[in-house]
Structure formats: C-alpha cells, structure tokens
Swiss-Prot record:
Record flagged with keyword Repeat: yes
Entry-linked InterPro entries: FN3_dom, FN3_sf, HCF1/2, Ig-like_fold, Kelch-typ_b-propeller
Fibronectin type-III domain boundaries: 1244-1341, 1346-1457
Subunit structure: Core component of several methyltransferase-containing complexes. Component of the SET1 complex, composed at least of the catalytic subunit Set1, wds/WDR5, Wdr82, Rbbp5, ash2, Cfp1/CXXC1, hcf and Dpy-30L1. Component of the MLL3/4 complex composed at least of the catalytic subunit trr, ash2, Rbbp5, Dpy-30L1, wds, hcf, ptip, Pa1, Utx, Lpt and Ncoa6. Component of the Ada2a-containing (ATAC) complex composed of at least Ada2a, Atac1, Hcf, Ada3, Gcn5, Mocs2B, Charac-14, Atac3, Atac2, NC2beta and wds.
Kelch repeat spans: 85-133, 135-181, 189-237, 259-307, 308-373
Reported function: May be involved in control of the cell cycle.
Official protein name in the record: Host cell factor
Signal peptide: none
Length: 1500
C-alpha cells in the first residue's frame, strides 16, 4: 500500500497496520496559544547546519531516576502541559491504552491521578489540547481501522472525564472520524485540520483518505458545555491533504494577529511545507522562509517556546531524490532539531552534540512539550531498532534548554545580624545556579544640617555673635516639608555664631537651584487671578525653621517661607483674599538662646492653622496646631532640637480646606507670643525684653515695628505688623508680613476666657497650654500676651498622678467633638486622668483638638499667674514623654458641632489591656458626640524622639500614628468631615495614604484598640478618585512600635503628605520614593521617577533615643496591584530586618490632581506610556534611585505584593525642592526642573535627581558580586567589588563554566547598613534576567533577632497553637516579650476599592515563646488564596532596646475554607514567578518568594 510507513502489530493482535493508520503525530497546542510562557531567544541565523555561536548552549540532557510509577514506552500518544506538569494520555505499543500519566518537571516525579467520569476508550494519534485546566481529546484510532470523532473533556482540577456532544455546524456535517489530524488551540477556539480517514466500512479493509478540511470548535460561552463545530469560510489556496503533520499557533508581534501554522506531515510521501492561516481574515498563505529548511518529515513534534517553533524527530526520507518524490518508499527516523523563528520565518537548523550518549535516539511518534525554557521529549518509536513483529519504543525522557532562564525571584531575608544577612530564595524553574549581587545603599554623612545651612540660606549678614542666626527664604512649595534629617545633632550645623539674616530679595538670586526651588515664584498680578489659572497656587503660609542645639550656645535659626496650595473652591481664604506667600523680606528678629526658653513672635492669618512643634531630646516633643482658633498638638518627627513652621494646604478632590497649616517646632519649650495693642508692649523671651513700639491710640490694622534693643547692636526693622482689632474681644494678632504683599499677612488671633479657672493635678511632663490674658480697658497694660503657648517646669509633688491639660477655644463657639485620652507610661499599670478639661473661648472652631499626656512618674499642680482669673498649669520635665499625635481636621460649614463646651470634663469609657499594659479609653461627653474625632492614645515605653507622623483624617476612620516610642493615637473622623490637613514637618511621614483594612465603621472602641497594635503592621496605599498616582510608602524603620501606632487611612480620598490630596504625582504604577528602611525593593518604575539619590540619612541615635524605636508595629504596604504571597506549601516566613525611622527619611510628595498631571517632574504622560514597557521589566536600572515596582499594574499572583517603597532618603532641601516642583504648575515646572540638578551638585550627601529610565549608572550604583550558588540560600558576609567583577563578566557564563571567586578580594558587610540584593538564574544557555531588587539592613548591636522554627498546630476547641524558638541569645539583652500578629479581613469599604487591602492585628503579647490564637480571632483572619489558602502570622521578639526583626509565616488551610473568602486580585504576572511581601515599620520590609523547602525551621 502506498504511503506505508511501517508495519506495526502493536495496537492490535499481531495484525498488520498500514503506515497511514499510525503515521500521525501528536500536536502540542497548549504552548501554542500560551503567549505568557513564551521566551525570547537571542539567536542568530546560522550558516547552513553549523551551530551559531549564540546557540552553543543547546545541550540535551536526559532525566535520570524519576520517581513514581513510570508509564510504559509507547508511541502515538500525546502530551500537553499545565504549568510545570506534563500530562500524557493514550498511545500504546502492545495495544492502545487509556492510561493518563502526569510528570512533574520540577519534582522529577511521575504519578497517576485517579480518573472518574466518562473515561474515553484508549486512542492513539488523536488531538489533544488544553485551555486553562480543561483538556480536550478528539478523534484518534481506537483499534485497527477504526477511528473516532468523539470529543471528551478532562477537568484537571477534579481529574474527571466528560463526553461532549458538540453541535453540528450551521452548514455542513461534523468532522468525520479520523487520526493523525492537528488539533490546535488558537486564541479561544480550537482549530481542527486534516488527518486520515478510512473510506471503507470494513475496518479490516482500510481505504485511507487524506483530509484537508478545516473546522473550528467553540467551547466558550453558551457552547462551553458541549461545544459547537463551525465550518469557516477561508480564502486562498488551502494546504494539500495530509496527516501526521503538526499545527502550532502564534501571534504576530507587529499586529498581534493570531495565526495557525501547519508544518509537514504525510500524503503518500513526506511533506516539508509550511502553511499559514491568518485567523482574523481566515486567509491561507504559504510563507516564504529563509535559511536551510529541514528534511520533510511526518510523525515529528513541533513545539512553541518563545517566538520559535522547535521541530524534533519524525520520519524523514532516506534518500532525497526528486524523481522519486511521489513514490518515495524508504525512510528513516531522525533525532535532528530544527528551529523556525516565527518573526523572521527563518530556519535555524542546529547541529547538536554528535555523541550518541548525549542526544536522544532517533524516534518518531513521540510526544514533546515546552515548559518555560525547556523542551521535553518522551518515548516514541525507536528509529534504529525495529522488527517485523515488534516495535521497539524508547522509554527515556529528555529535555533541552532552549533559552536562558526566566528572571529570578526576589531574595528573602531569613535572618539579619550585625555583620551578616542570611538570605534565601525560591528556585527559579529549571535554573541550575544563581548569581547574587549586592549594592550598598550609601548613607550620607550626618551633614544634612550643614547642607541646608549652606545651600538654602547662606547669604546671611552677620550682625552679632551673641544672637542666634535667622535665615529666611521664600518657597512656593505647597507642602509642609520639614527641612532636614535630624539626628542627635542640630538640623543646621551651628557653625557661625553671628546672626544671619538672609532673604531672597526680588531682584536677587541666592543660587539658581535654591532660587528656583526654595525661593518664591514671581508674584502674580493679583491673588485672585493667580488662583484662577493655577489651582495649585498657594495661599499664604510661612515656614519657619528654628533649630537649636543643646551643645550650641548660638543656634542657627532657619526661616523658610512657603505658600500653601489652594485647590478648587478653596482658593479664597475666609477673609476673602488669598494668602500670598511672604516673599523676600528681611525681618529683624532676635531670638536669644538661653538655657531655658527660646521665644519667637509669630502671627499667622486666621485662615492658616498654626502648628507649634516643641521637640527636645531631653523632653517630649509637642506640636501645637492652630486651625483658625483650634489647637492641635502633634508630635515632633525629629530626633534633634529644632523649631519649624511649615505651611501646607489641605485640599483634595473630596477634601476641601481653605486654610494652610503652619507647623512650628522647637527643641526647647517655646513661647508663641501675640501682643495686643497697647501703648507699649514688652515681651520677655529667654531673658531678653522685646518692645513693641506703637502709637498709644490704636486703630484697627495699625502697622508696627519691632525694635530690638540689645546693647550695642543696630536696630533693624521687621516687616510691618498689622494689629487687627476684634469687636468685643481684646485679643489681637500680630502679623508678620511682607510690606509689599498685603495678601501675605498671616495672623493668629488670641482667645480670651474671662473668669475661667483650671487647676488640676498634673504630671511631671510637658504640658502644652493656651493662656488667655484677662481683659484690660484702654490698653493700659504694658505687657499683654493674648495667646501664650508655654512650656514650663513643674516641680514634682504628691498630687495623685493625674495629668491635666487645657484646650482653649474661641469664646462663644462650640468645640468640635473632641476626645482626649491621657495615658501615663510608668512601668506599671497606666492610670488615666479623670480631670481633663476642654475650654471654649472665642472664635470659631472648625477642627478637632487632641491633647495627650503620657509617661509621668510624679505629678504636681503648678498654678501660673492668674490672667483674667484663669489659672493654668504648665509643666516641663526632661526625660518625660509628652504629647503625641494630633489630627486637625478642617470641617465643612455643614459639619455638625457639639454643644458649646466650656470646661467640659471628659468621661472615661472603658479600660483595656493593650500590649500587656493597661490603657484607658476616654469617651467624650454625650453633648459633644455629634461630631468630631475620637482619639485614643496608647502609652509609649521610653523617652525617644523618633519620627512621628501627623496625618489628617479622612471622613472614614483613620489611624494616626507616631513613629517612635510614643503613645499611639487612633482618630476616627466622622463622615461630615470633608477636609483634611496634614502638616508634616519633614519627610518622615510614610503612611499618609494607606488604607486600613481592619476597622469597620461600627467597630467599638475596644475593637479598635485591639487592631491598633497591628495597625501599623501592614498598610495599603489607597488610590482615591482623581488620584493620578499612587505612592507606596514603606514605613521608616520604626514607625510603629509596640508602644507606637501607625496611621492607617481608609478614606476614599486620603490625605497627602502635606495636603489633603493624594500623596504622589505619578501614575498609579509608579512608586517613586526609595527609602532604606523601606526594605524590600520594588521594581518596574514606569514613569519618570523623582529620586533623592541612593542615600540614607544615617542618624546615630543614642540607646535611649532608640529605646522604643525598634518595635513590632510593622506595616506591610501593599502595592495597589500586588498582594499575593508566593507559592509553595512550605513557604517559610519572610524575615524583616530593622531599619530605624530616624535613619531614613521618606520623601513626602503631594499628588497633583488629574487635571494637573503635567506638573510632575518630566512629562507624566510620556512616562505613562513608558509604564507599559517598564512593567514588563523585572530589573530596575541600577542607576535609578528608585526601584521599579514589578507588576504595578496589578499583574501579580501574590496576595502581598511588592508594596514597599524603596524610600529615598533625602535631605530637607531635596524634599522641599521636590515637593515644590511636584506641586508647581506645568508652566512653572518646565522653568524650574532644570535647576534640580543644581541642587544635586550642592547637596553632596543627598541628591535630587529626575530619573529617566535607562539612565547610566553612577559609581555608587554599581552592583557587586556576592557569588554564584547552586543552593537556595546563602549567608552574605562579604562581597567582591565591581572593579574586580563587572556585570559583563557574567554574560558568557553558563552552568558548565562557573567562575572561581576565591581569588578575588572581598569586602565585609557593615553593621547598621542597608544593602540591595538582586538575583539572576543560570542554566546551560547562560544567565537570565536580573530579578526584582530587595533591600535589607544589617542589625545594630543589641537588638534581638527574629524568632525561628515556628510551628503551628490546630486545636478544634481553642484555635491555633503557635510555638517558636527564641532568637539567638543576646549578650546583654534578654527577651522581654514577643508579639504575634494576624492578618485580618478587609472591611467592606476596602473590598470595594480597586485592590484589596490587608492589615494585621496583634493577637498575643507576652514573654512566653508560645501562644494560642482563639478561634474567634481566626474567624476574622484573612485567608490568602493567591496560591494555596493560608493564614498569615508574624512574630517578633523584643528586648530592652526594642523589637527586632519579625518572622512571617503562612499557615496553610483547607482549600475548601478558601472558597468562603474572597480571593485577592490575581492579575497576570510577567512569566509568573511568585513572591510574598511582608513589611514592617521598624523592621526592614522584605518581599520574597516562599521557601519551598521549608528551610530554617520556618513552616508554611
């Protein structure tokens, strides 16, 4: 019979079978349509059959010693792949079988699943495709001469067969029974082409008929159950009839069109032609190819990997003779490999190893699948060994590496120590070795203060060596950025003892960069016109930096004026005018530094909330914020002594506030004095008298001059001061304004509460009070201070340990609902004061007031002098913790206020134990419950000046957190609040925009307290409407300790760092700031990134300062698109290493509204286009200071994604400049962006750069090599400098020629230093792409390590029982306690967001290294279903210095339980490596893949 390939008694009882019966080849469709798994190959077309130099990595390898029940050798079978599984069905040798075997290419294991349902008869030479987990089998030979046209579906999730009955086509008949056809998945449909039919009714009398018909099988939509056959109308010449050919599908790269490619087969003789069906137009064509085509063949395999088709084996003609082409009857099997580049249609015939033992034997009728970078071939007929009575089949399994490995996963931190980092990583599929590289994150010297002093305000004019320096600059930044990374030393190095009064005159440029970034913009023709055309233009606000040093007798004071942006309807201040910037004036102010106080006369307009921050290393940090007449106390974010006023505008899409915020910070108790008009007013500040000389008769708006009367010193004038008289009330505000800008006047109106007296027991701590003087007629007082913000000393005595405070409000105006909780933080149980008083004075209260007093050891009542009969208490004691977080929320006019309160006591609501310590929550009076904020303050445990974050509240419940050893505050805002203000004195605020997934609106206060401990553990960035960008902030080091809280925002519009706008300007995928403490790297920055060089402001804090800084209040920040942990049942926990918040600053950036996207640095739209490209990049350009986030568009398969910002440590100048640039209108951005580079030059330690993708790497960003490892873990103690081994060194290596690194010198790791790591996999083809970057930090001595060997057992009655091994013994510190955190479900509102959010709750704190989490808590646990259902725990240990790194562990659950939980978003990931993300505030956030082998005793 013509066309007989062989005589094979294999499939029936010794009967002869024509070649056409079984001369059919399996089709691998699974890979054909799976574009996500395609791998790019960098190959050149070889000359002839010679192996090109780029293809030298092609080496066959035989799989040795697989485990499990191996299938019997066979041919005529087919195989598809589902992920890393190869599924083999049918075929046979001594009879056709219905066996199904599965081979796991990762574990090298065969297994036989238990099948159920309508198991089909054994068949051979059938069609086999896969769509997701649905496999379809069509046709084939059932027995000799009997073919099938039945269709079966196999569901891989249940291994259940189902027979399908597809509908017939609308015109024509269903496909006839056949074998040797191609069955190819093209897009969402299955294409059936050709095959061999039997025209005889008698199976024994076989009459072969070659087919070339084309059918489409639709298995989607309404046809998903049974399917439907479609006979498409095609154009062009169809391929000739054939069988035993192959079909693959691919997409044209240029236009994305899907194509069906038919190759080879048999039709009486071997065929070697190619036919292309363009499925959009259904047009057949015969593509032209270049290169030397392989021999014609049938029963071969064609497999798509990447953009290439790999043809292996099959029957080929024995002799090529054109005259016998139609009658050729001699053939042979081959083991050659041919490669067709589908983009260029070029054949790349490859010559492989000729040693017989190193290559598969020649075969036909085998099966082949492509799994990632490998081509697997199994069994088939042995072409060299055939007999008349028996076919010999191969029983070997081979694979061929055809491309370099996929990009490696992110490295995980197992354990951190002072001089070593133990890392681990998940195996990259088919990688044989790994290259690990390291990059040190340079930590600038502690000279940021000097930078500021020199760069911002260096044009001072010395006037006296006995006075403090005052530097004044104008700035248009709308953000309240604290300037400077503050360490134990002063922010501004106090090198000059002379007074410096510098200003930016209109005609003078201090420096190009400083002038552009810090100097005010050109004055608008009118404030109104400016606001109309520039919604981002700023209202009036003044920024003062007053920095004092305990060690310095002549501290330098830096005053910076900035405008606060006013957006939308908020362009007008309450007075009807826009508060313009205080530009270019040279005030004459003498701040005399004494050992007791430093005083500054400050006045701002009523529309500008004023925050006074009083930090001190010896005492607690306090900030008093005044919004109109309301007070706000916010903690200091600095570890040094500085007085600052920063201006910011709280405005956003859903947040409206017409006032800016001024923050005044000072290191010592300060007095903010406001004088009322009298014939003469004197103020004693720091032992010096200041006289205000003015006319005896004062009319409203009298302009005054301050005269400094120090002996021997010249008198200099200050900008004129306006006194605005108020009817009915004596208080008047002193306004410091530019004499040329009437709209720039800001003022504070004092309040007067006649006859009120407050005298309560008070703690020996710092108490901030507002003192209102009594009323005098006729201006006869020589000295009147209408508002005194005073910190004084209180001598301890036995008055009962009750702290007291006073909030004075404008008279006649009800206070907004205020809840004040005061918690003392002694070593024992905390006591809560019952005598807290809020007084309302005059004016209008539109915000919330929060005062908390903690950490007292002794108390005393200390009455002051009576002013108008009102007695107030002041106290100040070094070493005592003070007021914590406050949130000033600007309320709308429709906000419901509580009744007018004057001296309203706060009533206790409930007492709880938090962190093992008693805490009492105070609830407001019922009359005040109509609106306002509830504030909860948790006790701190040490006196530490660590960064704190003051955040505005959205209308939803929010956490306000302090980042150091300070009490935690949780503030819940009512729905009526539509304005938010976030005065942030420096870039240390990290989580202004993170949504809370743990708090429901109806949560009782005690529930909130429970979640407060974990509040800071994991923060999700909330993307609000109109938010053009999303910033993922990694908390600096210790933003949440066990005794400090983290701020979680759940509002739709979250408050930006200094505005109520969203925090970052970039489009959502862009996460731009990189911070050392934001440990884990992020990759794929998709837009122009604004970066402050890879520098970390290393602030050396004393042990005392760091007591509470190390803590477990960790936050995992979820990227909007990334939230799913890595795969694998034995995923071990990610270990987080600690980075102190004081050692790294996060640059706060305000987001520009959508209509101002052009205001970003660089062109935002251009970079949005770049996003798509960079999302596909796993590797961040080493030169970029920002690491690009992988899958920022939501394309992750993990539940906790790479959310941590690589936070960029920036100097204050950089932060301010960047902030200003971001918020500046586009027209101004272009003119100013060019000057950013100049700041880079000026700020040596902290550079600001506009990062454009693919920038060249600088010297500090070179990667150094740790080594090449075949294991999946390594303890890094040293590395080889890049000068010895560069990146190009690894370009030519593969697994067979690994270098020897022992000859190179190595550099040891340093303690307390942050490093970046990246990993690359190596196989026989070479080195793959670099994976995502992770950042970890070596420990500082004295802190505990991470718990290990975590074991979790389940008790049906009690819950989950956790045990763990303590960290390695500390030399000097003992473990005091452990904290265990549990990931909890998101709230309903959070679920409604674009991306689910995750939060942690502390479920245990105690000294024992074991705990039981009750079922009640587990019922609220978040079940991560990204891979295998798991509950996530975190455990950290604490010693006397603080909390060490945490260990995260995933506890696998029953998959059935996962169905009851909403799975997290699982978008497509670039080639699929998975990783888990864990973050903490003081613990270096790490994001890594699970440890598949459960190393280090960590259990999944």
């Amino acid at each position: 019979m013509e066309g007989s390939d062989f005589v094979d008694p294999a499939f029936s009882s010794g009967e002869r079978i024509s070649a056409s019966d079984l001369n059919s080849e399996h089709i691998i469709q699974a890979e054909n349509h799976s574009f996500a798994n395609r791998i790019s190959m960098d190959m050149d077309v070889p000359d002839g059959h010679q192996l090109d130099s780029n293809l030298t990595g092609f080496r066959w390898k035989r799989v040795l010693n697989p485990t499990g029940p191996q299938p019997r050798p066979r041919h005529g079978h087919r195989a598809i792949n589902i992920k890393e599984l190869m599924v083999v069905f049918g075929g046979g040798n001594e009879g056709i079988v219905d066996e199904l075997h599965v081979y796991n290419t990762v574990t090298n294991q065969w297994y036989v699943p238990v099948l159920k349902g309508d198991v089909p008869n054994g068949c051979a030479a059938y069609g086999f495709v896969v769509e997701g987990t649905r496999m379809f089998v069509f046709g084939g030979m059932i027995e000799y001469g009997k073919y099938s046209n039945e269709l079966y579906e196999l569901q891989a999730t249940k291994w259940e067969w189902r027979k399908m009955y597809p509908e017939s086509p609308d015109s024509g008949l269903s496909p006839c029974p056949r074998l040797g056809h191609s069955f190819t998945m093209v897009g969402e449909k299955i294409f059936l082409f050709g095959g061999l039919a039997n025209e005889s009714d008698d199976p024994k009398n076989n009459i072969p008929k070659y087919l070339n018909d084309l059918y489409i099988l639709d298995t989607r939509g309404v046809h998903s159950h049974n399917g439907k056959w479609i006979v498409p109308k095609t154009y062009g010449d169809s391929p000739p009839p054939r069988e035993s050919h192959t079909g693959i599908s691919f997409a044209t790269k240029s236009n994305g069109n899907l194509n069906l490619l038919i190759y080879g087969g048999m039709s009486g003789c071997r065929l070697g032609d190619l036919w292309l069906l363009e499925t959009d137009s259904m047009t057949w064509s015969k593509p032209k190819t270049s290169g030397e085509a392989p021999l014609p063949r049938s029963l071969h395999s064609s497999t798509m990997i990447g953009n290439k088709m790999y043809v292996f084996g099959g029957w080929v003609p024995l002799v090529i003779n054109d005259s016998k082409s139609t009658t050729e009857r001699e053939w042979k099997c081959t083991n050659t490999l041919a490669v067709l580049d589908l983009e260029t249609m070029t054949w790349e015939n490859v010559t492989l190893d000729t040693v017989e033992e190193n290559v598969p034997r020649a075969r036909a009728g085998h099966c082949a699948v492509g799994i990632q970078s490998r081509l697997y071939v199994w069994s088939g007929r042995d072409g060299y060994r055939k007999a008349w009575n028996n076919q010999v089949c191969c029983k070997d399994l081979w694979y061929l590496e055809v491309s370099k490995p996929l990009y490696a996963v992110k490295v995980a931190l197992v354990r951190a120590s002072t001089h070593a980092l133990e890392l681990s990583w998940t195996a990259t599929t088919f990688a044989a070795a790994y290259v690990l590289q390291i990059q040190k994150i340079e930590q600038p010297l502690n000279t940021s203060s000097k930078l500021l002093s020199n760069n911002i305000v260096q044009q001072g004019t010395p006037t006296s060596a006995e006075t403090s320096g005052i530097n004044i600059s104008a700035n248009r930044s709308g953000s309240a950025l604290g300037l400077g990374v503050e360490a134990t030393s002063t922010v501004l190095k106090l090198e000059k003892e002379s007074l410096q009064l510098s200003g930016c005159q209109p005609e003078t440029n201090v420096q190009p960069s400083v002038n552009d970034l810090l100097q005010s913009m050109s004055q608008p023709s009118s404030p109104a016109s400016r606001a109309d055309k520039d919604p981002l233009s700023s209202g009036g606000g003044t920024t003062f930096n007053l920095s004092t040093s305990v060690a310095s007798v002549h501290p330098q004071i830096s005053v910076i004026s900035s405008t606060a942006a006013v957006t939308g309807n908020d362009t007008a201040s309450p007075s009807g005018a826009i508060n313009s910037i205080l530009q270019k004036f040279r005030p004459v102010v003498t701040a005399v530094r004494t050992s007791t106080t430093t005083a500054v006369s400050i006045a701002t307009s009523t529309s500008d909330p004023l925050s006074v921050r009083v930090p001190s290393t010896m005492s607690a940090n306090v900030v008093l914020s005044s919004s109109s007449s309301t007070l706000r106390i916010v903690p200091s974010v600095t570890a040094s002594h500085s007085l600052r006023i920063a201006s910011s505008q709280a405005s956003g899409n859903n947040c409206r506030s017409s006032s800016a915020i001024n923050i005044l910070k000072t290191a010592l108790p300060n007095v903010a004095v406001q004088s009322q008009p009298t014939s003469s007013t004197t103020t004693s500040i720091g032992g010096k008298q200041y006289f205000i000389q003015k006319p005896l008769t004062l009319a409203p708006n009298v302009q005054l001059q301050f005269v400094k009367t120090s002996g021997g010193m010249t008198v200099q004038t200050l900008p004129k001061v306006n006194f605005t008289a108020s009817k009915g009330t004596p208080p008047h505000g002193i306004s410091i304004a530019n004499p040329h800008l009437a709209s720039g006047i800001t003022q504070i109106q004092g309040s007067t509460v006649p006859g009120s007296q407050i005298q309560k027991p008070i703690v020996s701590g710092n108490v901030l009070k507002l003192v209102s003087p009594h009323t005098m007629a006729g201006g006869k007082l020589i000295m009147k201070n209408s508002n005194i913000l005073q910190m004084g000393k209180v001598t301890p005595n036995v008055m009962g340990g009750k702290p007291a405070f006073v909030i004075t409000n404008k008279q006649g105006t009800p206070l907004g609902n205020q809840q004040i909780i005061i918690v003392t933080t002694g070593g024992n149980v905390r006591s809560v004061p019952t005598s807290t008083v809020m007084t309302s004075a005059g004016g209008s209260a539109s915000g919330t007031n929060i005062v908390s007093i903690v950490n007292s050891t002794s108390t005393t009542p200390s009455p002051l002098q009576a002013l108008s009969g009102q007695k107030t208490l002041i106290s100040n004691q070094s070493g005592v913790k003070m007021l914590r977080n406050i949130s000033s929320v600007q309320a709308s006019s429709s906000m419901a206020f509580g009744q007018k309160q004057s001296g309203t006591p706060i009533h206790q609501k409930t007492a709880l134990y938090i962190g093992g310590k008693a805490v009492t929550v105070m609830s407001t009076n019922t009359s005040m419950a109509a609106s306002g904020n509830k504030v909860m303050v948790l006790p701190g445990t040490s006196s530490n000046n660590s960064p704190a974050t003051t955040t505005a509240l959205s209308a939803r419940k929010s956490f306000v957190f302090n980042a150091g050893g300070s009490p935690r505050t949780v503030t819940l805002a009512t729905k009526s609040i539509n304005a938010k203000s976030i005065p942030q004195s420096q870039p240390v605020t990290e989580t202004n925009n993170h949504s809370v997934a743990t708090i429901k609106d109806t949560d009782p206060m005690d529930d909130i307290i429970e979640q407060l401990d974990g509040a800071g553990d994991l923060l999700k960035l909330s993307e609000s409407e109109g938010q053009h960008g999303s910033e993922e902030n990694e908390n600096n080091g210790e933003n949440a300790t066990s005794s400090s809280a983290s701020a979680l925002f759940t509002g739709g519009d979250t408050a930006g760092p200094s505005r109520a706008q969203n925090p970052i300007v970039m489009e959502h995928p862009v996460d731009i700031i990189e911070d050392v403490s934001g440990v884990s790297s992020t990759t794929d920055v998709n837009e122009t990134a604004i970066v402050s060089g890879d520098t970390i402001e290393s602030l050396k804090m004393s042990e005392k300062e760091n007591d509470d800084v190390k803590s477990m209040g960790e936050k995992s920040i979820l990227s909007d698109d990334c939230h799913q942990p890595t795969t694998s049942e034995t995923e071990a926990a990610t270990i987080l290493t600690t980075i102190k918040s004081a050692e790294a600053l996060v640059l706060e950036t305000a987001e520009i509204r959508k209509d101002h996207t052009g205001c970003t640095i660089g062109s935002l739209k251009e970079n949005q286009d770049e996003n798509k490209k960079f999302k596909q990049r796993q590797e961040s350009s080493p030169s970029q200071n920002i690491h690009q986030f992988q899958n920022v568009d939501g394309s992750q398969l993990e539940a906790l994604a790479s959310a941590a910002l690589l936070q960029a440590a920036t100097s204050d100048t950089t932060a301010l400049a960047l902030k200003e640039l971001i918020e500046r209108p586009e027209s101004e951005t272009n003119t100013r962006s060019s000057n950013i580079a100049e700041i880079q030059q000026n700020n040596v330690q902290s550079t600001l750069a506009v990062v454009v993708p693919n920038t060249s790497q600088n010297e500090n960003q070179k990667w150094h090599t740790v080594g090449v490892f075949k294991d999946l873990s390594h303890t890094v103690t040293s590395y080889i400098d890049s000068n010895c081994i560069s990146d190009s060194f690894f370009d030519g290596i593969d697994v067979d020629n690994l270098p020897d690194f022992s000859k190179f010198p190595r550099t040891n790791l340093e303690p307390g230093t942050a490093y970046r790591f990246r990993l690359s996999a190596i196989n026989s083809c070479g080195r793959g792409e670099w994976g995502e970057i992770s950042s970890f930090k070596t420990c500082l001595p004295g802190f505990p390590g991470a718990p290990s060997a975590i074991k979790i057992s389940k008790d049906v009655k009690e819950g989950a029982h956790l045990t763990w091994e303590p960290p390695p013994a500390q030399k000097t510190k003992e473990i005091i306690e452990y904290s265990v955190y549990l990931a909890v479900k998101p709230t309903a509102k959070d679920k409604a967001l674009s991306t689910p959010q995750l939060a942690f709750v502390r479920v245990y704190v105690g000294a024992a290294n074991q705990c039981t989490v009750p079922n009640a808590s587990l019922s609220n646990a978040h079940v991560d279903c990204s891979n295998k259902p798991a509950i996530i725990f975190r455990i950290a240990a604490r010693n006397q210095k603080g909390y060490g790194p945490a260990t995260q562990v995933r506890w696998l659950q029953d998959p059935a339980a996962a169905k009851q939980h909403t799975p997290t978003v699982t978008p497509n990931l670039k080639r699929g490596p998975e990783k888990s993300t864990i973050g903490s505030s003081n613990i270096a956030n790490t994001f890594c893949s699970p440890h598949k082998r459960g190393r280090n005793g960590l259990h999944d």
